[in-house]
Amino acid sequence: MPVVIQADKSDLRQGPVMVTVEYQIIPERKADFLDLIHQYERIRRRDGASEWGIFYDTEAGDRYVEVFLVSSWAEHQRQHERQTQADHDLEQRLVSYIAGPPQVRHLIYAQAKE
């Protein structure tokens, strides 16, 4: 599930970075999904996320969006390196509750020029 995007080295200090992961859940697995995604919060925070949340789409009740913030692009790249086997196993269980691959987006804070 991790999506590693190569950034130009000059961009590594940019931040903060908001990562969104959109899940289309299997409706009958909703309770299992929510239980597991809240366990995943601990992993995100351990690996550097300062904020974390899971939200559902009011127009499409089986669509959930995980959102977390990290301090910089470099810190987000390090998150991928910190994944343990236990994290991977939990992630595989999470994937079994969704229909199709999650959609990951990376948004870097847009600063005004001084």
Question: For each of these PLM feature ranges, what is it?
Answer:
Residues 1-15, 51-63, 88-114:
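Glycine-rich beta-strand-turn "strand-cap" elements at beta-sheet edges
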Residues 17-24, 53-82:
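Short, well-ordered beta-strand segments in beta-rich or mixed alpha/beta enzyme
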Residues 24-35:
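Short, surface-exposed ligand-recognition loops at beta-strand->loop->(often short) alpha-helix junctions
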Residues 29-31, 74-76, 112-114:
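Residue-level signal for secondary-structure boundary sites
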Residues 42-51, 69-105:
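An amphipathic, aromatic/His-enriched active-site/gating alpha helix that lines ligand/cofactor pockets
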